[in-house]
């Protein structure tokens, strides 16, 4: 208790102000301590940020090293293709082009141009201004793929075209289309002067990206004459890959400006090479399907677009498959068929096909009001997809479907009620539409013009008609087409492979000779014994 009392007195003494009215200075504010702690924490976070930046830079340098080694390997494949006259090595290099193009940057291309263009100073000086010169660091990569005598040897045209193509792709991905156009024009000028079969595959890729550059610049009409000239040259040289690529580029060019007649003439006057790869075949079938759809050949359009989906890659090219599905759905609706609901439920297609799903529902039910609502809501999207013109034609199909639904529901109905249900202007319009539906075989009915009503006839047994037979024929033809296309897509050994193989008759003769020789040997062995 005494200790507690003394402690209280000491506390009271400390609480009293000092003599003279002066007070002790207040203790330092705790904010100063907090600011110091925050500063220390800030310096620590800055250190961590620097460490992360250094780690990121190190990983980027490693990725650049791998990319340069890949480019070096692709160049080696091109050189092997030229020396061995084997185009499959060029295909190996071009097959990795999408993966390589995603990893390109200023540093990689600067090192590649400096490393490969050792003897061709003019091309090197032309390409380097389009790239930013990297800063010299201690960890800078020394990339010298050509040393010794190879450094002074001229670069192969295939390798030079491949490296310039990488530059064009990089500038396109960077949205520097004007600069990409300059390099691509220079590349086309060099390719046009060459006549080398090993260059054909690389040139086909160059044509594709050359047209893409002009498409981004909205100058596709400028490049059309050049593509025609290269198509003539590729056809005369039997360059299948170049011919397929150029045909597709010209069709895309015509369809971009809605020149369907010129596109149809090009398709009819040219032959698409059978040796073309599946990707080019898929593009060609899609373009021809669009042409056939515009020209009212809906059955042929559906066939070609179904084949285009079959030729397309199964797990990639999602955008291409979405585009084909949009047009295919509209064509099937124009044919009077309703697309399968599972088609709209695929995860990769569900979102993009939603407007077309609503359109299909409107056509299936024959609801003209809902059809007009979908058209008003998604009209701009349909125009962007290039299907708006075909969808406008669906209005008559919607009306026909509505007439058929009314005919199935009512044995007799007045023309005024039909006009009201179909949202037509007058009963006379309904009379014309019903008369046309009867003439086209959409419904089985008769019109009483005096009393103004439609009398539906009794339904006949559909199995007594030819419709089931035609449906089975269509399915069987589809299966046979799949079988024939699968056989064509298979790889078979060359004909020279059979030269070294003996026929069945030759094999029998050889076996007979072996048996006779064995008998003679046995007789000789028997004679050798006394």
UniProtKB/Swiss-Prot annotation:
MF terms from GO for this chain are: enzyme regulator activity
The Basic and acidic residues compositionally biased stretches are 1-16, 497-521
Instruction: Supply the alphabetized keyword list.
Output: Isopeptide bond, Phosphoprotein, Proteasome, Tumor antigen, Ubl conjugation
Q: Where is this cross-link: Glycyl lysine isopeptide (Lys-Gly) (interchain with G-Cter in SUMO2)?
A: 36
The UniProt record lists the Glycyl lysine isopeptide (Lys-Gly) (interchain with G-Cter in SUMO1) crosslink at 36
Work out whether the entry's keyword set contains Phosphoprotein: yes
Query: Where along the chain is composition biased (Pro residues)?
Result: 17-30
Q: Which SMART domains match?
A: PAM (SM00753), PINT (SM00088)
From the UniProt entry, list the residue stretches annotated as the region Disordered. Answer: 1-65, 496-530
- Per its UniProt record, what InterPro entries does this chain match? 26S_Psome_reg_C, CSN3, PCI_dom, TPR-like_helical_dom_sf, WH_DNA-bd_sf
Q: Which residues carry this modification: Phosphoserine?
A: 414, 426
Spell out the GO cellular component terms annotated for this protein, sorted alphabetically and separated by semicolons.
cytosol; nucleoplasm; proteasome accessory complex; proteasome regulatory particle
Q: Which GO terms describe its biological process?
A: regulation of protein catabolic process
| Task of the protein | Component of the 26S proteasome, a multiprotein complex involved in the ATP-dependent degradation of ubiquitinated proteins. This complex plays a key role in the maintenance of protein homeostasis by removing misfolded or damaged proteins, which could impair cellular functions, and by removing proteins whose functions are no longer required. Therefore, the proteasome participates in numerous cellular processes, including cell cycle progression, apoptosis, or DNA damage repair.
Q: Subunit structure, per the record?
A: Component of the 19S proteasome regulatory particle complex. The 26S proteasome consists of a 20S core particle (CP) and two 19S regulatory subunits (RP). The regulatory particle is made of a lid composed of 9 subunits including PSMD3, a base containing 6 ATPases and few additional components. Interacts with UBQLN1 (via ubiquitin-like domain). Interacts with ERCC6.
Family listed:
Belongs to the proteasome subunit S3 family.
From the Swiss-Prot or TrEMBL record, give the protein name. Answer: 26S proteasome non-ATPase regulatory subunit 3
Species source reads Mus musculus (Mouse)
Specify the taxonomic lineage: Eukaryota, Metazoa, Chordata, Craniata, Vertebrata
Gene name, Swiss-Prot/TrEMBL: Psmd3
């Amino acid at each position: 208790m005494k200790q507690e009392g003394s402690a209280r007195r000491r506390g009271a003494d400390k609480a009293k102000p000092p003599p003279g009215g002066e007070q002790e200075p207040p203790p330092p504010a705790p904010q100063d301590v907090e600011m110091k702690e925050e500063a220390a924490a800030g310096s620590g976070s800055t250190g961590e940020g620097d460490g992360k930046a250094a780690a990121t830079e190190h990983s980027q340098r490693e990725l650049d090293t791998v990319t340069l080694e890949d480019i070096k390997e692709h160049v080696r494949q091109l050189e092997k293709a030229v020396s061995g006259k084997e185009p499959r090595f060029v295909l190996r290099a071009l097959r990795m082009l999408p993966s390589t193009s995603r990893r390109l940057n200023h540093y990689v291309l600067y090192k590649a141009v400096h490393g490969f263009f050792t003897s061709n100073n003019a091309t090197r000086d032309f390409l380097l201004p389009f790239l930013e010169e990297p800063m010299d660091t201690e960890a800078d990569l020394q990339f010298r793929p050509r040393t010794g005598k190879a450094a002074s040897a001229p670069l192969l045209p295939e390798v030079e075209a491949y490296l310039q193509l990488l530059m064009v792709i990089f500038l396109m991905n960077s949205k520097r289309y004007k600069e990409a156009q300059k390099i691509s024009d220079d590349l086309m000028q060099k390719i046009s002067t060459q006549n080398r079969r090993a260059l054909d595959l690389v040139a086909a890729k160059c044509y594709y990206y050359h047209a893409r550059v002009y498409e981004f610049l909205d100058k596709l009409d400028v490049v059309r004459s050049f593509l025609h000239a290269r198509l003539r040259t590729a056809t005369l040289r039997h360059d299948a890959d170049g011919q397929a690529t150029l045909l597709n580029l010209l069709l895309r060019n015509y369809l971009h400006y809605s020149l369907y007649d010129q596109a149809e003439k090009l398709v009819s006057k040219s032959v698409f090479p059978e040796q073309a790869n599946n990707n080019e075949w898929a593009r060609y079938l899609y373009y021809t399907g669009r042409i056939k759809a515009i020209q009212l050949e809906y059955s042929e359009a559906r066939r070609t677009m179904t084949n285009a989906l079959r030729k397309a890659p199964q797990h990639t090219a999602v955008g291409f498959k979405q585009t084909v599905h949009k047009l295919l759905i509209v064509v099937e609706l124009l044919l009077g068929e309703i697309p399968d609901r599972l088609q709209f439920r695929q995860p990769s297609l569900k979102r993009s096909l939603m407007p077309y799903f609503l359109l299909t529902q409107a056509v299936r039910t024959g609801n003209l009001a809902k059809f007009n609502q979908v058209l008003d809501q998604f009209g701009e999207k349909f125009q962007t997809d290039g299907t708006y013109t075909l969808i406008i034609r669906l209005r008559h199909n919607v009306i026909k479907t509505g007439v058929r639904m009314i005919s199935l529901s009512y044995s007799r109905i007045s023309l005024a009620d039909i006009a009201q249900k179909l949202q037509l202007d007058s009963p006379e319009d309904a009379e014309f539409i019903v008369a046309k539906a009867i003439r086209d075989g959409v419904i089985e009915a008769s019109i009483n013009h005096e009393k103004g009503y439609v009398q539906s006839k009794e339904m006949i047994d559909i199995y007594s008609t030819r419709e089931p037979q035609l449906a089975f024929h269509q399915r069987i033809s589809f299966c046979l087409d799949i079988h024939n296309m699968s056989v064509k897509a298979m790889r078979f050994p060359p004909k020279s492979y059979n030269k070294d193989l003996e026929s069945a008759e030759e094999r029998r003769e050889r076996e007979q000779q072996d048996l006779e020789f064995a008998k003679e040997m046995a007789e000789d062995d028997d004679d050798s014994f006394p």
